[in-house]
C-alpha cells in the first residue's frame, strides 16, 4: 500500500520552537531531533486537499535514483558565460572565458547527462547555429576553457 508524505512538515516542526506533533508537546528543538519518527519527511493526514504537497513515497525514491546528474537549465535571455560559470561552480569547476564572443539563449533548454555529455551537447547546439565556441575540459584541475578558433 502506498503512503503519502508531506515534505515540509518536518522542516516546519524543527524550525518552530514549541510544537504539537501527533498529540505530543515538544518544548525544545533537541527533543524534536531526538524523536526517531521525525526525519526529513513526516507522515501526516491523507487528503485530496493537500495533493500539491504530497508525494507518493515509491515515486519520490524512484525519481531520486533515476535522475541524471548534472543537469544544466537555460532560459530565454540567459547569457552563456554567466550560466556556464554558475553551473560549473556548482560542480567544483572554474570557467576560463578565452573568447570575445557572447551567446544569449532565445529558448529554454535542459541539458542532461554526465558532465562531459552536457558540455558536448551544449557546444554542438552552439556550433549548429554558426557560433564558433568550443569547450576544453581539464578534469585534474577542474577547469573548463571556453575558446574560439576563428
Curated annotation (Swiss-Prot):
Q: Which residues cross the membrane?
A: none
Q: What is the effect of changing residue 55 to I?
A: In strain: Z17561
- An example Pfam family from this entry, by short name, is TcpQ
What this chain does, per the entry, is described as: Involved in TCP pilus biogenesis.
Name by which UniProt lists this protein:
Toxin coregulated pilus biosynthesis protein Q
Species of origin: Vibrio cholerae serotype O1 (strain ATCC 39315 / El Tor Inaba N16961)
Species lineage: Bacteria, Pseudomonadati, Pseudomonadota, Gammaproteobacteria, Vibrionales
Q: What gene name is listed for this protein? A: tcpQ
Amino acid at each position: 500500500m502506498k503512503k503519502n508524505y508531506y515534505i515540509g512538515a518536518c522542516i516546519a516542526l524543527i524550525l518552530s520552537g514549541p510544537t504539537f506533533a501527533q498529540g505530543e508537546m515538544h518544548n525544545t528543538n533537541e527533543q524534536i531531533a531526538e524523536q526517531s519518527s521525525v526525519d526529513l519527511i513526516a507522515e501526516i493526514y491523507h487528503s485530496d486537499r493537500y495533493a500539491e504537497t504530497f508525494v507518493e513515497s515509491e515515486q519520490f525514491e524512484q525519481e531520486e535514483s533515476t535522475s541524471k546528474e548534472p543537469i544544466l537549465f537555460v532560459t530565454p535571455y540567459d547569457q552563456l558565460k554567466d550560466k556556464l560559470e554558475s553551473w560549473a561552480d556548482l560542480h567544483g569547476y572554474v570557467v576560463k572565458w578565452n573568447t570575445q564572443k557572447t551567446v544569449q539563449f532565445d529558448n529554454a533548454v535542459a541539458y542532461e547527462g554526465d558532465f562531459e555529455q552536457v558540455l558536448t551537447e551544449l557546444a554542438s547546439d552552439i556550433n549548429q547555429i554558426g557560433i564558433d565556441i568550443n569547450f576544453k575540459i581539464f578534469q585534474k584541475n577542474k577547469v573548463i576553457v571556453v575558446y574560439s578558433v576563428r
